[in-house]
Swiss-Prot record:
<keyword id="KW-0963">Cytoplasm</keyword>
<feature type="active site">
    <location>
        <position position="64"/>
    </location>
</feature>
<comment type="similarity">
    <text>Belongs to the methyltransferase superfamily. L-isoaspartyl/D-aspartyl protein methyltransferase family.</text>
</comment>
<dbReference type="GO" id="GO:0030091">
    <property type="term" value="P:protein repair"/>
</dbReference>
<dbReference type="InterPro" id="IPR000682">
    <property type="entry name" value="PCMT"/>
</dbReference>
<keyword id="KW-0949">S-adenosyl-L-methionine</keyword>
<dbReference type="GO" id="GO:0004719">
    <property type="term" value="F:protein-L-isoaspartate (D-aspartate) O-methyltransferase activity"/>
</dbReference>
<protein>
    <recommendedName>
        <fullName>Protein-L-isoaspartate O-methyltransferase</fullName>
        <ecNumber>2.1.1.77</ecNumber>
    </recommendedName>
</protein>
<dbReference type="GO" id="GO:0036211">
    <property type="term" value="P:protein modification process"/>
</dbReference>
<comment type="function">
    <text>Catalyzes the methyl esterification of L-isoaspartyl residues in peptides and proteins that result from spontaneous decomposition of normal L-aspartyl and L-asparaginyl residues. It plays a role in the repair and/or degradation of damaged proteins.</text>
</comment>
<dbReference type="Pfam" id="PF01135">
    <property type="entry name" value="PCMT"/>
</dbReference>
<dbReference type="GO" id="GO:0005737">
    <property type="term" value="C:cytoplasm"/>
</dbReference>
<dbReference type="InterPro" id="IPR029063">
    <property type="entry name" value="SAM-dependent_MTases_sf"/>
</dbReference>
<keyword id="KW-0489">Methyltransferase</keyword>
<keyword id="KW-0808">Transferase</keyword>
<dbReference type="GO" id="GO:0032259">
    <property type="term" value="P:methylation"/>
</dbReference>
Amino acid sequence: MSDDPETAERKMRFLFALRQRGVTDPRVLEAMERIDRGEFVRGHFEDRAYDDTPLPIPCGQTISQPSVVGLMTQALEVGPRDKVLEIGTGSGYQAAVLSLLCRRVYTIDRHRRLVAEAEALFRHLGLPNITALVGDGSRGLPEQAPFDRIMVTAAAEDPPGPLLAQLKIGGIMVVPVGQSDAVQTLIRVRRGENGFDYDELRQVRFVPLVEGLGQT
């Protein structure tokens, strides 16, 4: 079914805003055009699905600002044969975007409700290359390591050691670093033969990366 004129206009403005804020990779823009953010926003916030702003979701979490999703995805430099680990499933929006750019996405969240709802959306949208798991994201997913790319959508005080260890040589991790009650710095980590290189990308604000499992 085609969108009504108002929704179509909002989606067009949404994509224009992404470009204005620095999302220029054609593959990333195409993926974000194909994955409708409106599918991942519910309740009172549905009419803001195409605004460039973070929005609340259940379990005290948020769906990230679209331009930040685009810039993080762009910084990850995902290739079509890559195996990607995402820490922090949340609404499932970021994993859905990544799934159009790579071979396989593993996404972990500490909240069972969020994983169940995201899995239902992935099935509804026909995205079979995403595996969503309930777990402690700070520990990564060692049984599937190493990963070509790792995306962390929650802030850690430092890049988590277990995640660095699960990054393939030649791989890239994008992670927000800093205190949870302050503005954080988004960094890109590249793993080389002799260690890790770090690039600061921009200031961001994310919910904290919490160890253990949630109550819901």
